[in-house]
């Protein structure tokens, strides 16, 4: 069973641990089963994209990766 967290989608949070420590940003998604959140502009990774009809050349995109919910704190106010 997933744990209930106080952080919700759209909340402002501050990263308190990791490479992006100190950044304040908005939560894009909460993954309660994994205990992780995706935060805008935090832990951005480059992902390879295969060529498709929409994107015939393929290439790389920057995508936010999930971080552990214990590494963020909700910003009040």
From Swiss-Prot:
GO biological process, one term: translation
Pfam family, one: ribosomal_L24
Coiled-coil regions, chain positions: none
Alphabetical UniProt keywords: Ribonucleoprotein, Ribosomal protein, RNA-binding, rRNA-binding
Any one GO CC term of the record: ribosome
PROSITE patterns: RIBOSOMAL_L24 (PS01108)
Recorded superkingdom: Bacteria
SUPFAM superfamilies, A to Z: Translation proteins SH3-like domain
Quaternary context: Part of the 50S ribosomal subunit.
HAMAP family: Ribosomal_uL24_B
Family, similarity comment: Belongs to the universal ribosomal protein uL24 family.
Protein's name according to its UniProt entry: Large ribosomal subunit protein uL24
Gene: rplX
């Amino acid at each position: 069973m997933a744990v209930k967290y106080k952080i919700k989608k759209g909340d402002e949070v501050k990263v308190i641990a990791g490479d992006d420590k100190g950044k304040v940003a908005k939560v894009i998604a909460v993954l309660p089963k994994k205990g992780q959140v995706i935060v805008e502009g935090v832990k951005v990774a480059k992902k390879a994209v295969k060529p498709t009809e929409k994107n015939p050349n393929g290439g790389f995109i920057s995508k936010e990766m999930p971080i552990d919910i214990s590494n963020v704190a909700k910003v009040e106010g």
